UniProtKB/Swiss-Prot annotation:
SUPFAM superfamilies: Ribosomal protein L16p/L10e (SSF54686). This is Large ribosomal subunit protein uL16c. Its main location: plastid. GO terms for cellular component: chloroplast; mitochondrial large ribosomal subunit. It comes from Phaseolus vulgaris. Part of the 50S ribosomal subunit.
Amino acid sequence: MLSPQRTRFRKQHRGRMKGISSRGNRICFGRYALQALEPAWITSRQIEAGRRAMSRNVRRGGQIWVRIFPDKPVTVRPTETRMGSGKGFPEYWVAVVKPGKILYEMGGVPENIARKAISIASSKMPIRTQFIISG
């Protein structure tokens, strides 16, 4: 699963997901892509599940590019713990995704295969997405 090798700080604020994605909203590498339509945190497990689903469907042909990276730590408190006594420990990593962000790209395969693979990957995502074609 994806996670940063080292970070400057162990814990981060939760932040807000306002507006639409201004970066990473165009197809750069492949011909087909999966684009987010809603804001969300996407975990490294979900990213990996989508990638595996796509690569299983495409077999040897074609290439897949993952355009998001989980660089935000999410902290979790132990269960049945009283309030206070600091922030919890980092439990998992998420990628902050805004509407318009490209999640995956694919190339080197026919459109019908790409559409099928990307639809399976989209079912692994916790948000609404759309299939787009470059050009």
